[in-house]
Amino acid sequence: MDIRKRISIVLVALLALVGVSAQAQTVSGMLIDGQHKQPLGYAVVQLLGSDSTYVSGTTSDDTGRFALAAPRDGRYILKVSFVGMRTLCHDVVVAGGKDKEVGALTLQADEHVLREVTIAAQAPKVVLKNDTFQYNASAYRVAEGSTVEALVKVLPGAEVGDDGSIKINGKEVKKILVDGKEFMTGDTKTAMKNLPASIIDKVKAYDQKSDLARVTGIDDGEEQTVLDFGMKQGMNKGFFSNINLSVGNHGRYSERGMAAYFKDNFRMMGFLSANNVGDMMFGGGRRGGFGQTRQGLNNTKMAGINMNYDNGKTWQWDGSLRWNHNNGDLQAKVFSDNFLASQHAYTRRISQQYTRSNSWDGRFRLEWTPDSMWNVMFRPSLQLSKSDGLDVSTSATFSEDPYAQGDAPLAEDLLATMQAQGTLVNRQRNTTVTYGDNTSAQASLQVNRKLSANGRNVTLRLQGNYNDADAKTFSTQDLQYYQLLDAMGQDSIYRAYRYNLMPTKSHGIGVEATYSEPIARRTYLQLAYQYNYALSKSDRSTYDFSSLGGGYFDGVEPAYRSWGSYLALLQQPLGSYFDQSLSRYSEYKTHTQNIQLMIRMNQEKWRFNAGVQLQPQHSIYQQDYLGVHVDTVRNSFDWSPTIDFRYKFSPQSNLRLFYRGSATQPTMSQLLDITDNTDPQNVSVGNPGLRPAFTHRIHAFYNGYRQRYTQSWMTFFHFASVHNAIGNSVTYDASSGARVVRPVNINGNWNLNAGVMFNTSIDTLGVWNVNTFTTVDLNRYASLLQQSRQSLVERNITNQTNLSERLTFSYRNSWLEVVLDGSVEYNHTKNQLQSAQNLNTWRFAYGGSINLTAPWGTSLSTDLHMNSRRGYNDASLNSNELLWNAQVAQSFLRGKPLTISLQLYDILHQQSNLSRVVNAMGRTDTEYNSINSYALLTISYRFNLFGGKPQHPAGVRRGDDGPMMGPPGGRPPMGPPGGRPPMGHPGVRPF
């Protein structure tokens, strides 16, 4: 057949297909919660025939919207059901081949459920609706003026890390929503540290579907865990604000303001804050756990605005803009025990680091749905940042435990003693001044077209990114060896004084097309193709002043961007110190294709996704470094299988099983057979024989809920094993303390993480409650160690076991909450080559908290916890710390909008800051500086204007059921210490 005829036939067939699909009819509408007058998401919506036979079904989205397919004209029954609501049946007539919009449908609460709630008197702490954990904020009391971070910390199954990361039921939270709307996308900290807990009614934790799954209606398994904060009834109309001013001793302060405006379909929130206390809530940490490690002193400022608009029909948009400023003052005392084949290597380091940064981040999302068949989504973003850093450190390496000689290993007398004993390997001092300027932009456009009402659709996605970075670094390194002699028989000395200019640019574009075809009832075949192109260029210029002699720059006081002071001492033009071999130019191009084939089965009780992704890649790498020119091409082929199964036993009980395999290619720099000895203490060597690593990931999750006893439970299991993991082979030189690191393929790396959570009321009124959360973490790290180039390579295995249990008992009524809690964490580390370095450490925490509210507006919050450590080599770390924090607050004026409070932190002056990290290469204990004990006097004022009239509702405390529950917004109570006032160009203080 002639090729033109074939093309004509295909075009005619496609036009016919589009013509037929254009006749498809859709029944759509919106669901409303009749009690709270809010959109009702996750309700089950079914379209039944006139004889009640099933036709199609779906669930309402976060905004309460739904859309179902009606295959032909006729009479239908629209059935809507939701836990705790009366089932609604609505007659629908579809005629003339046109879509049917049924408008807003209101569901009323089930009277039987209402009677149960009335009898209970106290709202259940947590309920489960479909796949959503819904926490009632009124059931968790936090101190006056708290932000939602304090609220999240006391939720069952929640963890807030030292870096501000959030985990719910073992899954990391990637996004924050407010009333189902995007909020400060890409930044969870802004919401956590600025949203007042007093305005929150419910906190939902669930997996939000991807943009593609949401518009196609076909679950693609690419969801991300979100926290959705639901505001109290009546607070999403009009204007309200919270202003908080705090001042304390030791120069502590915390100021924060928040304002929100809601009108019709538009909402806007603005934030301002400045503090040097970290805003990390109660110093004793979460209930039943340990406080967060305070890493230095920090002075932060923030301004942000978030806007949302939804006309309920065709247009939605979300936008956010934020500015962040940070000044940091971090002093770290680090002790490392490095796992070597048959010999010890200990390192003690003290560093003083100053940092400051300014950043802007703007993000926008525009969604246009002109009709039931088309959806267009556009997401642009822009980030600007500048940063400065100053780091001065002193360190020494030993062949024997230096603490056997004394508690200050870097003291001159102890260093002299260990030098005489032959256990001092090296000693060094480093100074580094850094600057960075970065601009980046991203954009994506997604267009979806439904070709029929039964799931046939096509999606086109375009994306691009651009990055322009400029960095400068001036560094000095003075290193003295005590077991390595020079030609004169003296201790060897190495020095490196260098100035680096490092411009970097990169950009990328991508295009993706996805087609979904229904092949059976609720079964779809999905084919996706994606092409990405990326280009990255880096051109580092290095100027080497090492030949000028030791101490040449000792007269310069280190400060931000002070390289001018260093360069002014040069006797020759800067260009004469240019070092071609140390300079590095690289250019990296990649052409990546992703081909994915998936089968998706979305049944009423279960969902099953299975498929495979193929990824051929073509890479071109050019580099000029250390006198070696590289121009190489690599072609690789990766594949990734996926299986995802979900079963819904009931609306309150769900099971999910997930498997994914993925390949990881070694980087080009790892493959190049080049020895990089620019840092003699850390020499890297490439390995052309590296193979790609393949990771197997298995996840399981099960949850359930029993409404009668307000019982909820959850268990999860995560396992990952890596075949041909890209690890390191380390050769240690005992005479210098230097390491030669070469990437190698290692088998035997895996990790397992599992947990169980159970929450229940003891009595029928829900006054007495118990929560338990148990976790198990098992990690196995493999590495290769070599004592010298002539010795044998030995395989080292480090096994780490971490067990933890948190138990909480609580009593609460309308004016009092009493909590007793405790936790225990056991960590066992076993090293194969050095059994003497096996570790068994324990951490205990136990105590309680009280929140009391008097009718006349006085409130008292206090917590008392004993934190204990055992099993650390440094005896000073095996401590008992009794942490006591307290706050007293008094509200004034009609409606209690004005509150004055006094917060006392670490009253007994016993809190310390310590972190431990264990991996295949060793263990590291770090102690940080901080101001833990201080007091703050806070004035908070809340203003509300709804419907054009100012309102100051009764100042009822969190836990009552008034329309404006909770304390006035304010500063997060009991925050840990932060930083100093803004620093200019700090000098370096002696240790």
Report each predicted region and the residues it spans.
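Structural motif
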Residues: 30-40
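Short, acidic Ser/Thr/Gly-rich low-complexity loop/linker segments typical of extracellular
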Residues: 50-65
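Short, surface-exposed beta-strand/beta-hairpin micro-motifs centered on an aromatic residue
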Residues: 61-70, 165, 191
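Periplasmic plug
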Residues: 128, 165-213, 226-231, 266
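Short, polar/charged loop or turn motifs at beta-strand boundaries
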Residues: 132-154, 167-168, 178-183, 244-249, ...
